[in-house]
């Protein structure tokens, strides 16, 4: 049928369910399609727009009955907003199936509150006359506001129109009334104007099974566009003349709307049409001949309110849309309906005539033979929006038809069917050639079964077809001329596709299953018993897509005159071939009507004959062509209810099923079918294989393994193959394979062994790792306990106070020292007592000797007054010492010891040493200078007294671990980090105690960094900062007043008085609790207690009771003194440790 699609300006793809606004949507002019409208005897389309029928003019319907009524004003319909829609049965009790409803949404952009109404003729009781609109009502530009319908239908994305218009907005447009041509070619045209009542309150329908949100399946969408120039054609579905779109003002499409009832007037000279019923045609038409052979009740086509609106989201240009029914809208240009035969006629025709039609004796309408052009859009070639129009030869039946003069020439010569890229099937009546084997699709051009023509494939493919296919096509094409040459005495008796011969049936059935070219592209099933006959699954990427259950028989497969009888297996093969067929444009289910069920057996037989002829014609096709598939979607629930699925036929005997048709078991079976090495197709093995045998074949099958190694390796499998393999015809083959003498080892068994071995190794590794983890955890626990039981001691003090000497004494006393005396035996002590460590100390001792003599000689000239040599002959010795002062890596030759010994014996050098408080001299200078004769020996080994006195500048952090009476001590010496003390001091906030070392004899000395700062004053300042440090406020301090031997020497010498550096000493008296050493001079006792009280004054002045100061008088170089002092401190340290962990 002809149709005119109207889309508003803003109805683009992706704008779904957007209600129109007043002045929002630009209106579009109707586009002029290619060709002219079918000529008629009556007034033309332009005249009909201005002509009103007389009041008593009869309005013939489809069933040879006239409805006459008094004239009624169209305003009466406008004023009845609650008028209900009544469904009138076709042929007495016909209700159109759900899939025949219009898949479009008709929206009036600016008609205000006017809605289309259904005109019910005859006995329905509703107004039956043709009512004319007031021109003001039809104007879309009426500023009354657009309101979306309450029951408006919004199509899903796949059912929207596959094209979009972008037209400039116009102000006022006048929409012409609907125009319906005569039933027969050349007849007068009747126009039907519609009145738009107010918006009805209830738009539901009772018997059609629709809801207000009904969504038809995608295969019923429109597969072509109307823009002839841009989209490749403007022809209607076959059998109907082309629509002539009316071009309005400004180039905009007017919105088309029509009531559900169409009252059509036939031509006066129209030949009678035999219309048995409304079922059985591939396309339902809105017209019937008034000259029926028998009288039936008035037929009214009832359908839901349809709206042509914007395209939904996700709609492409190649979306398939059903064209079973003409798109009828509320207002718009006329829709022309030709006198093509009716699809539904086949279901209700008399048994004799239906039998004659099934055997191929039905006359062919002359109109069906004059279709000349069919566009072809091959996959992968060209754009879907610009298909190529292929000119083909008209069928010979066009010349022999007796009524060909009455046919519409324009509809026969200019009808162009635009087919989407997914429609690859064809129905060529007289194929001049076959499509090339390399193409993706089967026949790349196909016409509609009821289109009145059977176009052939393009002539360009003649070079590519095979000779066998051409030879098969010629004899099969001869019978087509015989039934086609008969005069069309009954133009609507039977569509041309029902009388298509063998060649036509082959094309209608889609692809050929035998050649594997199109395994899933057979025709739509000829029997409704096939639930998936609507279309095959779409693509291999969509294996779950199933066919529409409500498919019906393709009418092209209805009659094959030249087909011979077929066996049951052949018929089953034809049914299977039809099951996997491509989408047949316009095919729909008829199982909802009883009349259709009556004709199912005859259609099944016709489908079998059609499949047989199809295999004969396509025998020469290549099997390498890729299959073409149509993108489909499962039907809506309404269609499934209308057409319940019927039992599925037996599996088709195709050579290799397509990917989306094979399940998991089929794939496994084909992969394992090579174990018997049967060099044949899978036709025999596939049919005989059962689920048990498939399980047997794939039991030990692994992906990626060669098939030759899957037999003979498993005894259980061999047993099943020998015991039950005879049921499948594979026992001998399996036995021969399993008993082959040169059989290699099964790689799967080797792989399993390797995997077991690796698993065992992995378990052993895990066990070892677990054991190691437990050992690590145990070690961590032990270290944690040791850490908690260890007394950590931090050594702090000013430079050259003797901290390193204390550490050395601890090693000597408690770590077996350097000579193995006075400590505990352990491995660490043994390593520290090695001769290698003592050897390294020899170089340090020599460096101390060299540094001492160089410092004294250099100070002789720098002191004020300078000191002269007692023996001037030793001047060259002084020059030698000064010359080697800055020599790195000095090797200490014998002359060095000779010059050093001579200078040390000089009285002037001794006098300079007495003034050592005026310059920086190491404390061990006198000790090592007195032992020059011992140190210069080559086999010199330092003694335990030499090692503590060795002076090495501390430049880092040194730690020493020792144990006293099974109590662990960890001592840290950080004396070399004086400048950055504030940055690292907080790291020792968890130590047990702080041992602060003070050089008591340094009261008359300056620090090495600054010659103006007194060393003892520097020690007092450092002690105060440590005592008041916020990180160390809870840590007690053990004060070591070191170098008591040197202090006694200075006090007794009287050369450097303490009151000269600390005036407070002059007023200081010895405390009563002072305990002097045996034989100690009282002056020495007074001096050492003065220094002690200076530090205690700082601790008591800022003490808060959380930490205490414990002073001790020590001599770091005296090992016994350090032992006694440290023993006294052990009790204090342990008490501090218990208080630290809150145990005391």
From Swiss-Prot:
Question: How is this protein annotated for GO cellular component?
Answer: apical plasma membrane; COPI-coated Golgi to ER transport vesicle; cytoplasm; cytosol; dendrite; endosome; heterotrimeric G-protein complex; membrane
- Is the Coiled coil keyword given for this protein? yes
Biased composition of type Pro residues is found at 644-654
Q: Which GO terms describe its biological process?
A: adenylate cyclase-activating adrenergic receptor signaling pathway; adenylate cyclase-activating dopamine receptor signaling pathway; adenylate cyclase-activating G protein-coupled receptor signaling pathway; adenylate cyclase-activating serotonin receptor signaling pathway; bone development; cartilage development; cellular response to glucagon stimulus; cognition
Q: In this chain, where does the modification ADP-ribosylarginine occur?
A: 951
Q: What is the effect of changing residue 977 to L?
A: Large increase in adenylyl cyclase activity
Q: Which family does it belong to?
A: Belongs to the G-alpha family. G(s) subfamily.
Descriptive protein name: Guanine nucleotide-binding protein G(s) subunit alpha isoforms XLas
Source organism (scientific name): Rattus norvegicus (Rat)
């Amino acid at each position: 049928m002809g149709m005119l699609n109207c889309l508003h300006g803003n109805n683009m793809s992706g704008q779904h369910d957007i209600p129109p606004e007043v002045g929002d949507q630009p209106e579009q002019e109707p586009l002029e399609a290619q060709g002219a409208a079918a000529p008629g005897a009556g007034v033309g389309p332009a005249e009909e727009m201005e002509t009103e029928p007389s009041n008593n003019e009869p309005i013939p319907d489809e069933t040879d009955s006239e409805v006459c009524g008094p004239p009624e004003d169209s305003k009466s319909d406008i004023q009845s907003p609650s008028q209900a829609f009544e469904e009138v049965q076709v042929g007495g009790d016909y209700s159109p199936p759900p899939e025949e409803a219009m898949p479009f949404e008709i929206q009036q952009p600016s008609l205000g509150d006017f809605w289309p109404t259904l005109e019910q003729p005859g006995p329905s009781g509703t107004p039956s006359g043709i009512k004319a609109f007031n021109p003001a009502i039809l104007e879309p530009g009426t500023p009354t506001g657009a309101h979306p319908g309450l029951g408006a239908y919004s199509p899903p994305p796949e059912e929207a129109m596959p094209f979009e218009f972008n037209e400039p907005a116009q102000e006022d447009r006048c929409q012409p009334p609907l125009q319906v041509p005569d039933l027969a070619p050349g007849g007068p045209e009747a126009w039907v104007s519609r009145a738009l009542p107010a918006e009805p309150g209830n738009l539901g329908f009772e018997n059609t099974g629709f809801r207000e949100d009904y969504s038809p399946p995608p295969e019923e969408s429109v597969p072509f566009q109307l823009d002839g120039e841009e989209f490749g054609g403007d022809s209607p579905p076959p059998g109907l003349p082309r629509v002539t779109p009316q071009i309005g003002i400004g180039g905009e499409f007017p919105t088309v709307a029509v009531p559900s009832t169409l009252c059509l007037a036939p031509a006066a000279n129209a030949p009678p049409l035999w219309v048995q019923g409304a079922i059985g045609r591939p396309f339902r038409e809105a017209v019937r001949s008034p000259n029926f052979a028998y009288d039936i009740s008035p037929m009214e086509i009832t359908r839901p309110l349809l709206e042509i609106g914007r395209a939904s989201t996700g709609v492409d240009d190649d979306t398939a849309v059903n064209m079973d029914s003409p798109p009828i809208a509320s207002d718009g240009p006329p829709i022309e309906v030709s006198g093509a035969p009716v699809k539904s006629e086949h279901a209700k025709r008399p048994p004799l005539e239906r039998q004659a039609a099934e055997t191929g004796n039905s006359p062919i309408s002359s109109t069906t033979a004059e279709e000349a052009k069919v566009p072809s859009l091959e996959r992968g070639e060209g754009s879907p929006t610009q298909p190529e129009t292929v000119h083909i030869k008209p069928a010979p039946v066009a010349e022999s038809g007796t009524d060909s003069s009455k046919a519409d020439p324009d509809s026969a010569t200019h009808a162009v069917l635009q087919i989407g890229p997914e429609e690859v099937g064809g129905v060529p009546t007289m194929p001049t050639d076959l499509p090339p084997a390399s193409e993706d699709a089967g026949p790349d051009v196909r016409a509609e079964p009821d289109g009145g023509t059977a176009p052939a494939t393009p002539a360009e493919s003649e070079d590519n077809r095979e000779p066998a296919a051409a030879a098969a096509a010629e004899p099969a094409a001869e019978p087509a001329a015989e039934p086609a040459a008969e005069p069309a005495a009954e133009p609507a008796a039977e569509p041309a596709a029902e009388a298509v011969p063998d060649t036509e049936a082959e094309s209608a059935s889609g692809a050929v299953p035998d050649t594997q070219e199109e395994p899933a592209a057979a025709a739509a099933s000829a029997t409704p018993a096939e639930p998936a006959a609507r279309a095959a699954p779409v693509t291999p990427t969509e294996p779950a897509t199933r066919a529409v259950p409500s498919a019906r028989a393709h009418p092209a497969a209805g009659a094959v005159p030249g087909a011979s009888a077929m066996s049951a297996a052949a018929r089953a093969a034809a049914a299977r071939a039809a099951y996997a067929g491509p989408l047949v444009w316009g095919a729909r289910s008829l199982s909802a009507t009883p009349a259709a069920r009556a004709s199912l057996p005859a259609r099944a037989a016709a489908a079998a004959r059609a499949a047989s002829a199809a295999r004969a014609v396509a025998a020469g096709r290549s099997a390498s062509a890729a299959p073409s598939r149509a993108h489909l979607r499962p039907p809506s629930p309404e269609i499934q209810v209308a057409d319940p699925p019927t039992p599925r036929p037996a599996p088709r005997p195709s050579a290799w099923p397509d990917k989306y048709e094979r399940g998991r078991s089929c794939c496994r079976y084909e992969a394992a079918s090579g174990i018997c090495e049967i060099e044949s197709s899978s036709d025999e093995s596939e049919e005989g294989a059962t689920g048990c045998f498939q399980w047997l074949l794939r039991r030990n099958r692994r992906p990626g393994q060669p098939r030759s190694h899957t037999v003979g390796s498993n005894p259980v499998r061999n047993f099943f193959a020998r015991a039950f393999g005879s049921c499948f015809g594979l026992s001998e083959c399996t036995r021969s394979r399993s008993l082959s003498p040169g059989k290699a080892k099964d790689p799967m068994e080797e792989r399993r062994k390797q995997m077991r071995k690796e698993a065992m190794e992995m378990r052993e590794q895990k066990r070892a790792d677990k054991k190691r983890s437990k050992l690590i955890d145990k070690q961590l626990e032990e270290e944690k306990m040791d850490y908690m039981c260890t007394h950590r001691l931090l050594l702090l003090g000013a430079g050259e106070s003797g901290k390193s000497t204390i550490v050395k004494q601890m090693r000597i006393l408690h770590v077996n020292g350097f000579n193995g005396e006075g400590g505990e035996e352990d491995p660490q002590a043994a390593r520290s007592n090695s001769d290698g460590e003592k050897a390294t100390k020899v170089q340090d001792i020599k460096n101390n000797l060299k540094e001492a003599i160089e410092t004294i000689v250099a100070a002789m000239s720098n002191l004020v007054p300078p000191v002269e040599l007692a023996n001037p002959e030793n001047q060259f010795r002084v020059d030698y010492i000064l010359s080697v002062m800055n020599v790195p890596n000095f090797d200490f030759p014998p002359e060095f010891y000779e010059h050093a010994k001579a200078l040390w014996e000089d009285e002037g050098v001794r006098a300079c040493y007495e003034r050592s408080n005026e310059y920086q001299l190491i404390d061990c200078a006198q000790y090592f200078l007195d032992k020059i004769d011992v140190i210069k020996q080559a086999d010199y080994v330092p003694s335990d007294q030499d090692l503590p006195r060795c002076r090495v500048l501390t430049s880092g952090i040194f730690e020493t671990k020792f144990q006293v009476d099974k109590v662990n001590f960890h001592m840290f010496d950080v004396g070399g980090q004086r400048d950055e003390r504030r940055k690292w001091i907080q790291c020792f906030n968890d130590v047990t105690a702080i041992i602060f070392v003070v050089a008591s004899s340094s009261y008359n000395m300056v620090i090495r960094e600054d010659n103006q700062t007194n060393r003892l004053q520097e020690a007092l300042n450092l002690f105060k900062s440590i005592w008041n440090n916020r990180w160390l406020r809870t840590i007690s301090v053990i004060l070591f007043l070191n170098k008591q031997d040197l202090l006694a020497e200075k006090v007794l010498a009287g050369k450097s008085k303490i009151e000269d550096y600390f005036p407070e000493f002059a007023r200081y008296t010895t405390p009563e609790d002072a305990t002097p050493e045996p034989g100690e001079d009282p002056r020495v006792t007074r001096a050492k207690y003065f220094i002690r009280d200076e530090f205690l004054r700082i601790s008591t002045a800022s003490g808060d009771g959380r930490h205490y100061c414990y002073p001790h008088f020590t001599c770091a170089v005296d090992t016994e003194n350090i032992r006694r002092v440290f023993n006294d401190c052990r009790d204090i340290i342990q008490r501090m440790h218990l208080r630290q962990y809150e145990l005391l």
